[in-house]
Amino acid sequence: MKNFYKYLVAIFLITVIALPVQKVNAGNKDRAGQAGADELLINPWARSSGWGGANVSCIRGIEGIFNNVAGLAHTPKTEIVFSYADWMRGADIRLMSFGLSQRVGESGVFGFSFMSLNFGEIDITTIDLPDGGIGKFSPRYLNVNISYAKAFSNSIFGGLNVKVISESISDASASGIAFDAGIQYITGELENIKFGISLRNVGIGKMKFSGDGYSLQTMVPNNNNQFTTTQRGASFEIPTQLNIGAGYDFLFDGSRFTLAGAFISNSFKKDQFSLGGEFSFKEYVQLRASYTYEEGITKPITDPTRTNAERGFAGGLTVQVPLKKESKSVFAVDYSFRPMENFSSVHTIGVRFTL
């Protein structure tokens, strides 16, 4: 088991070191907006999104699939999560997610989740009919994750995730495959010192749109023959991300306060620093808040150095009740709040069953 863990760490570190070879320049602000599939950077979950990314070292359960899949290994037995958000309320963008994790054996956990973005209905326009009136179409994004995490000891946890990415409109679509990997390490006499590292969205090749939308039918000049031309869509990379974090649990009589922070290295946007805390009262009520900083985030939205609509703050609340006193089964309602600049804030609500 120890040798297996050493090999896992070695492979993980080699992957991190090899990123420059793949031309992934972390924290390069000049590359902002040049990647696709940016929905991979949106946390869809109601509980963990209140942390703002600071909880890479202490995330637990199915929501760990988002920023550190190693957290999946802490699933007691079975966990089911539903979440919903109006992304930038008023823009008619609906964000829905579902996750299911199941412990297998003494130390392994399988996980499955998906996130769907629905942009509502948009008028179809053409060159001849720029004002529409000929119908509507609905863009859709869908990300599906299949994960496995394992507890290698009482202190060491690791996980891998495979994600399938799909983006589509009525006459064009793009798809891709990416991988995540993560490790968590817990130490201290009370197991209250935590470290975590995760590598997210390592794509296999690039994504590219294709379909009938890239074809154009026209007439040959001075001829009655019709011909079709097909354009080639430009390929694009997905936003790889490296997260490194640490956390500490302050334990009181029946309560807990967790302080955690993380450095978030982005391949197609500015690097970020996230700090957050969570207070848990007897595991029945949990309050959390965080702040994620990046260069220019405090400047007006019209400033050219600002490239993020989020204000950096996030917060959340969880209320959970036990289903069985003799087990860890709980039913919980999670909520998070993320304010935006010049857009309506994002409110996410979810329900969670731990069986």
What does each model-identified segment do?
Residues 15-24:
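C-terminal segment of classical bacterial N-terminal signal peptides
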Residues 23-355:
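Subset of outer-membrane beta-barrel
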Residues 1-9:
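Bacterial N-terminal signal peptides that target proteins for export
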